[in-house]
């Protein structure tokens, strides 16, 4: 059995850990509000752009549709973009995203597709490096705050690969922020743009619009921006989900530390009481012997 000194040291160590987890919980809670506002503010723009694209796509013939909308006519080469956070200590948040990415990569590979991978966030890079191997073509850090610059850089690389004929279909794997307690791993097709399965076309209230320039030219401008917008929106959703998951994980850790402190304190008190009782018995026995 551990000595009283060892037990006191262990209780002190757990208390120190509890202070750290409590502080991390409070920091995550403070950052969550800002991240949640940013994610929610970005949604209407991304949804509106998807609606505009769906409306414009309805007036475009198959031959005149841009490649980012119509595709290359093949689905042999796939690119999977996986977005996680750079840091951990957030429960199973990053693992759930990586698991969804693994399932998609393995499913595509089983179908005989040529799969390549781009990661955003160190956790995705570290966990997928062995699975992807040489198929991991680029890695990016998510950063402490999602930025348009990173989204534009990743978007440019994706579109460069698409225009060069290196990929036919692009998938984005990230975590949708549903609520503080719910973050859902999501797989979304970026290229070709999924207008039919995405947002409904705009309600034009019976009006007929003539576009100048025509729909094809507008889509040629909007579709590249849509890729960037969807990437930025996904990283913002990830950020909110990460802080929510971290806040929950640190709250659980703080509670568990409290339970452990209570258990160790009870054990310490019992051991101390037993030791005192033993010493008293020895003193009484010694006195009686005299």
Swiss-Prot record:
A cellular-component GO term for this protein: proton-transporting ATP synthase complex
Bilayer topology: Peripheral membrane protein
Keyword tags: ATP synthesis, Cell inner membrane, Cell membrane, CF(1), Hydrogen ion transport, Ion transport, Membrane, Transport
Compartments where found: Cell inner membrane
Family annotation (SUPFAM superfamilies): ATP synthase (F1-ATPase), gamma subunit
Domain of life from the UniProt record: Bacteria
One Gene Ontology molecular-function label: ATP binding
UniProt xrefs under InterPro entries: ATP_synth_F1_ATPase_gsu (IPR035968), ATP_synth_F1_gsu (IPR000131), ATP_synth_F1_gsu_CS (IPR023632)
Biological process, per Gene Ontology: proton motive force-driven plasma membrane ATP synthesis
Predominant cellular place of this UniProt entry's protein: membrane
One Pfam family from the record: ATP-synt
Family: Belongs to the ATPase gamma chain family.
Annotated function: Produces ATP from ADP in the presence of a proton gradient across the membrane. The gamma chain is believed to be important in regulating ATPase activity and the flow of protons through the CF(0) complex.
Subunit annotation: F-type ATPases have 2 components, CF(1) - the catalytic core - and CF(0) - the membrane proton channel. CF(1) has five subunits: alpha(3), beta(3), gamma(1), delta(1), epsilon(1). CF(0) has three main subunits: a, b and c.
Protein's recorded name: ATP synthase gamma chain
Originating organism: Phenylobacterium zucineum (strain HLK1)
Gene: atpG
